[in-house]
């Protein structure tokens, strides 16, 4: 009788743990409520004008849609100094407002970013060795404009190596649109475009920026660079999430 009771309790506990895990996965697709924050009222136009006067930006035009982008050299790399705005299937306007695209760019799923079939949101590209090797080419383009490509973790890390270790991304964040203004020391001009879950929830607009890496992380995840008002990190997220894209120039 005692043994049966122990077995019963063990089964119940296992069910509770599994249910909690499933619930946790569901909740991870919802935006957590946050307390209201004091806003930084520095106008976007003032930030942009200051940067245009301070930094030696290059520029190029994407032949696909006529969009023109600023570029900036940081160390030995040349980066787009704006988020990609190219409208493709599997891309979304930040906070679900098309009026945000001009400033914040668009949000893309990982497979859209890499310009590969959507089935790879849930499975590794290793099942197709030709695609697996193609993506790992140094200058694999993906959805980037011609002459640019989706950065790898190594390229993101090379960019971050230029930062003060204690800056927590402040040197990359713009002076506008963040609660805690960045110093934007390199003219990279990161704006908090937020992100989108695959269930349609748009999250953290005005509070967070996330950028894709082309590198896979497990079977259904990929790496991303994330900046908040006080942190910066590279971690894995669901490939079905929609994030911003910054492209780096081919070498």
Q: Which residues does each PLM region occupy?
A:
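Conserved positions within compact, well-structured domain cores
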Residues: 37-251
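Prokaryotic Sec-type signal peptides and long signal-anchor helices
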Residues: 9-12, 25, 192
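Feature marks short, highly hydrophobic, charge-poor N-terminal signal-anchor/signal peptide-like helices
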Residues: 1-10
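Hydrophobic single-pass membrane-insertion segments
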Residues: 23-32
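Hydrophobic membrane-insertion alpha-helices, especially the h-region
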Residues: 12-19
């Amino acid at each position: 009788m005692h043994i049966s009771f122990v077995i019963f309790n063990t089964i119940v506990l296992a069910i509770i743990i599994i249910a909690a895990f499933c619930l946790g996965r569901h909740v991870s697709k919802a935006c957590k409520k946050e307390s209201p924050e004091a806003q930084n009222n520095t106008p976007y136009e003032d930030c942009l004008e200051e940067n245009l006067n301070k930094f030696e930006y290059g520029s190029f035009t994407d032949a696909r849609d006529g969009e023109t982008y600023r570029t900036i050299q940081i160390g030995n790399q040349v980066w787009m100094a704006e988020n990609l705005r190219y409208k493709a299937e599997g891309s979304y306007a930040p906070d679900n407002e098309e009026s945000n695209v001009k400033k914040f760019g668009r949000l893309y799923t990982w497979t859209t970013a890499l310009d590969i079939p959507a089935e790879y949101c849930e499975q590794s590209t290793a099942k197709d060795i030709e695609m697996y090797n193609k993506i790992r080419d140094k200058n694999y383009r993906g959805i980037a404009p011609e002459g640019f490509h989706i950065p790898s973790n190594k390229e993101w890390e090379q960019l971050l190596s230029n930062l003060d270790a204690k800056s927590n991304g402040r040197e990359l964040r713009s002076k506008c649109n963040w609660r805690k203004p960045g110093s934007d020391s390199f003219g990279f001009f990161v704006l908090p475009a937020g992100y989108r879950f695959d269930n349609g929830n748009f999250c953290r607009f005005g509070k967070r920026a996330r950028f894709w890496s082309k590198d896979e992380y497990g079977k259904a995840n990929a790496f991303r660079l994330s900046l908040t008002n006080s942190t910066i990190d590279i971690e894995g997220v669901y490939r079905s999430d929609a994030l911003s894209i910054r492209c780096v120039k081919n070498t």
